[in-house]
Curated annotation (Swiss-Prot):
The chain crosses the membrane at residues 76-96, 118-138. It holds the Pfam family VP1_VP3. InterPro entries: VP1_VP3. Residues 1-71 form a propeptide. The gene is VP1. Keywords: Capsid protein, Membrane, Transmembrane, Transmembrane helix, Virion. This is Structural protein VP1.
Amino acid sequence: MRLLRSLARKIASLKEAKVALKVASDPRKYFNEEQMTEAYRIFWQTWDGDIIRSARRFVEVAKANPKLTKGEATNIGVLLGLFIFILIGIVLLPVIVSQVNNLTSGTSPQVTGTNATLLNLVPLFYILVLIIVPAVVAYKIYKD
């Protein structure tokens, strides 16, 4: 829980997060296919394992890239929002899996029976959300 609170505080301090959430509701207005391809390339270039440092580097590189600065200034906010969403999801996945395993396995599991079966499905649904949300956003952007 401390990890979640510290991540929430760090994300809340970013001014772009508010704009990112606003623009993420309809990204087709702000991106074209070329911009999404370039943002994806920059995403993997700037990722170094630290969410905050990677996000800052991503914004710096994206602002300097002429392919991404052609559109409105809110493009950076949406890209940052998607970047942070994916990074937090990747970082929290092992934590969720280990907590589910601790609750449902071992010599004296705390959750048994049908509830354990349902609890074991939580990581699967979490992974589906991590895949579906960026895919839907990318589809809406590509459709434009």
